[in-house]
From Swiss-Prot:
Keyword Hydrolase belongs to the record: no
PANTHER family assigned to the protein according to its UniProt record, in alphabetical order: ANTITERMINATION NUSB DOMAIN-CONTAINING PROTEIN (PTHR11078:SF3), N UTILIZATION SUBSTANCE PROTEIN B-RELATED (PTHR11078)
GO cellular component, one term: cytosol
Organism (species): Rhodopseudomonas palustris (strain BisB5)
Region spans: Disordered: 1-28
Pfam families: NusB (PF01029)
Alphabetically ordered keywords of this record: RNA-binding, Transcription, Transcription antitermination, Transcription regulation
GO molecular function terms listed in the Swiss-Prot or TrEMBL record: RNA binding
SUPFAM superfamilies registered for this protein in UniProt: NusB-like
Function (record text): Involved in transcription antitermination. Required for transcription of ribosomal RNA (rRNA) genes. Binds specifically to the boxA antiterminator sequence of the ribosomal RNA (rrn) operons.
Lineage of the species this protein comes from: Bacteria, Pseudomonadati, Pseudomonadota, Alphaproteobacteria, Hyphomicrobiales
Superkingdom, natural source: Bacteria
Protein's name according to its UniProt entry: Transcription antitermination protein NusB
Length: 174
């Protein structure tokens, strides 16, 4: 069996006080978003199935030490919800993202990792009403920063903001 390529995930922030950084729900959700984007990317470029991807990430990467790097623990149910939701709804999400992109920049032309970020963010904006839209947009811009330069994170921000205003207009009129 071929060893999977090491996904890029953030290391935990330094300890502060008695609480471990990974103990906070927000940290576990942030780690889940990052892992979900990496999993979606891996599925997109490698053709892996969802069950194999879940098994690999949950057993090998998330919350484990790999090659001297400690990966953040992630909220497994949240990770699974994002990945399975994007896979299930991709045919609805992609046209939404396409509409939000600048003319002449179809989603197929966008780098695979940015497609994964936008799909995950769009899914969460549509289906996870328990999380404020501005938080979702900000979190996925942060995830994008882990992979790409500032110009591309600006595009992620613009696209997800437009989608947020479409699904959650009431949050922007307050």
């Amino acid at each position: 069996m071929v060893e999977p390529k090491k996904p890029f995930m953030r290391k935990p922030p330094p300890k502060t006080g008695d609480k471990k950084p990974g103990d906070r729900k927000a940290n576990r959700r942030g780690a889940a978003r990052l892992a979900a984007v990496q999993a979606l990317y891996q599925m997109d470029i490698g053709g892996a199935g969802i069950d194999d991807t879940f098994a690999e990430f949950e057993s090998h990467w998330i919350g484990n030490e790999v090659e001297g790097d400690q990966y953040l623990p992630a909220e497994a149910a949240f990770f699974r919800d994002i990945v399975s939701g994007v896979v299930r709804d991709q045919t609805k999400l992609d046209p939404l993202i396409d509409e939000a992109l600048a003319k002449g920049w179809p989603l197929a032309r966008i780098d695979a990792i940015i497609r994964a970020v936008m799909r995950a963010g769009a899914y969460e904006l549509e289906h996870r009403k328990d999380i404020p839209a501005r938080v979702v947009v900000s979190e996925y811009v942060d995830v994008a920063h882990a992979f790409v330069e500032k110009d591309e994170t600006g595009m992620v921000n613009a696209v997800l903001d437009q989608i947020a205003r479409q699904f959650r207009a009431d949050e922007f009129t307050k």
